[in-house]
Amino acid sequence: MTRAGIRSIDTASIYRNEADIGEAIHRCIRDGIVSRQDVFITSKVSPHEMGTTKASAGVDGILDRLGVEYVDLLLVHWPAASKLPLGSEKNAALRKETWRVLEDRLRLGHARRIGVSNFTVDHLAELLEYAVIKPSCNQVECHPLYPQVALRRFCADHGVQVVAYSSFGAGALLDAGAFPEVHAIARERRCSAAQVLLRWGLEKGVCVIPKSVVPGRILEYGRGELEAGSDGRYLSEAQEQRLDGMAARYGERKFCWDASGVR
């Protein structure tokens, strides 16, 4: 935040780092580096906190650990409850209860926006049937090997923003030997492979939230080294098509949580 100008913080109950993040944010506020309004804080109700009572307590815990009166974005982290089978019908009922809690907390001012994470098209379609307040976003894994075409189309049709985590395929897509086209395009555009993958997501209308614990990489992700060509595109049509074709060439690959089996 102090060196790279980071203003978006993505955390979750299950990450167990909210207290440290809250302390760092308040230190930056105290030192005059940022104001609370400058920082966009996202947190998530965990699979251990599904259902009316647990979700309400979960939100209280998030605010307490972060030391804030509100978060800018509050998400349901996962469409199933912990310790329930993925195929249990109880998951749908607990999702609905949890969403009602998020709607209430939005009304109370404890969250500025609410959304979901790791929801499939079926989960979103079900949610939209009963939601009084529509989810602002769905945070999911999305990259050229797992492009989420159907989900992106559904979200676009229903006004739900897709937010991509794991834009680098858990780091696998940065392997030049395994996926040479990413690095070839990086050489053509005179930027890093990571910047190519982030730009691919942005060109698809997806928000990207790369993470790193390495200061140099954090700076790299935010730099504008990828310049637009004479046609105004940051990736040429041919370059984008090469990236789009990776899932067909190598087979779709999912590296993170898979919610496809959750009822």
Question: Would you name each region that the model predicts?
Answer:
Residues 55-76, 104-108:
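CE4/NodB-like, metal-dependent polysaccharide N-deacetylase domain
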Residues 44-53, 85-91:
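Active-site mouth loops of central-metabolism enzymes
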Residues 79-263:
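Beta/alpha (TIM)-barrel catalytic core signal, keyed to glycine-rich beta->alpha loops juxtaposed to Asp/Glu
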Residues 2-3, 22-36, 63-68, 128-131, ...:
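Acidic (Asp/Glu)-rich catalytic clusters
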Residues 1-39, 169-171, 262-263:
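N-terminal binding-site loop/beta-alpha segment at the start of enzyme catalytic domains
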Residues 1, 51-66, 122-125:
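Short, acidic/polar
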Residues 35-49, 73-79, 141-142:
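A short, structured active-site edge motif that brings together acidic residues
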Residues 9, 71, 114:
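Glycine-centered flexible beta-alpha turn that most often forms the glycine-rich phosphate-binding loop
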